[in-house]
Amino acid sequence: MGAGLRGCFRKRAFIALLLLSWLPFLVRAVQLYAAANFPQMAFFAPTAETFRQFLDQQSTFVFFVTVFAGAGLVANDRRANALQIYLSKPMTRAEYVFGKFAVLAILLLMVTWLPAMMLLIVQMVFSGSAAFLGRNLYLVPAITLLSLIEAVMVSAAMLALSSLSRNSRFVGILYAGLIFFTDALSGVLRVVTRDTGLAWVSFSNDLAQLGDAIFRVPLRYAMPWPVALVMVLALVAASAAVLERRVRGVEVVS
């Protein structure tokens, strides 16, 4: 896991992407400062929906970090025929998969959970009070839960796709296809049915619906949030099944 993280941080392009992903945090921080210090800027005052919208904004960066850091996690090992070497050590298949999973999940939490929690801290510092957090204490578990759900779903799906090919670029295309195709299909169904009840076909929509439910804001789609949860769990389960079949080697028990 440590080697995987170090490998990402050695790449200047990835560091630039991470820095770019924190720009929305800086913008929100300026807005919070203005709301706390200038009465005429009161319209920037934070609400629970402010943090929900922030995590929505970060979805774009989640996509790029996932493709950049996740596409080659298993594919590169397959290309180098390294799976046999890894799994011939006192390392189980589960340990190998968890290590790869943890690398991507940690990176995703760095662009979702970490800046969102920092925003809560910044709000308290600028306002000089914990009153907002006291009224909205559920934001801490809400931010944590949604960030974890997103990290688990996205990391599992990307690892499964990465295990299907030796070409990391092709894996990135597969992941983009999964996201954009399901989004497009959801859009077509919405036009045809004039309803959002079938929005669950898009995994992006499922995550958004769960986020709205977790943050206690109005749901954006006409589907029960448990349906969205089932779809997310189904994707994770399918990804685990793919990894179980594709990640193989000679396992040695110490």
Please name every model-derived segment.
Residues 33-49, 164, 169-249:
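Terminal transmembrane helical anchor/hairpin motif
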Residues 12-35, 61-64, 174-183:
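Hydrophobic alpha-helical transmembrane segments of multi-pass membrane transport/permease proteins
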Residues 30, 44-59, 98-163, 212-215, ...:
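Secretory targeting signals
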